[in-house]
Amino acid sequence: MEMVSKIACFVLLCMVVVAPHAEALTCGQVTAGLAPCLPYLQGRGPLGGCCGGVKGLLGSAKTTADRKTACTCLKSAANAIKGIDLNKAAGIPSVCKVNIPYKISPSTDCSTVQ
């Protein structure tokens, strides 16, 4: 019985050591996930797959660091991409029926995101 306990502990230790570490969210993932929103935000097309991308992003942003990264990336994109209707951007959470813990705006203070 003692040998079984030792083997079980060893197996558990191996599982902890080799368990994959969660990857941090990147700006590339944020922009790729929200790319379907661009035509809508620029007034060139329907909402389309935007809500799916938003929901996928919310599912990926599990930590405070991930949410801050997403906020910073969204803020940068809002400043860099010409022709974005900021009112439509701010309305995406409502339209997609999701809760984003900050306003999608170039003026958002991402350091306060939890």
From Swiss-Prot:
One GO BP: lipid transport
Transmembrane portions of the chain: none
Cited Gene3D superfamilies: Plant lipid-transfer and hydrophobic proteins (1.10.110.10)
Any Pfam family the entry gives: Tryp_alpha_amyl
One MF annotation (Gene Ontology) recorded for this entry: lipid binding
Signal peptide region: 1-23
Keyword field: Disulfide bond, Lipid-binding, Signal, Transport
Cystines in this chain: 27-73, 37-50, 51-96, 71-110
Family the UniProt entry places it in: Belongs to the plant LTP family.
PANTHER family assigned: NON-SPECIFIC LIPID-TRANSFER PROTEIN 2-RELATED
Stated role: Plant non-specific lipid-transfer proteins transfer phospholipids as well as galactolipids across membranes. May play a role in wax or cutin deposition in the cell walls of expanding epidermal cells and certain secretory tissues.
Record's protein name: Non-specific lipid-transfer protein 1
Organism of origin: Solanum pennellii (Tomato)
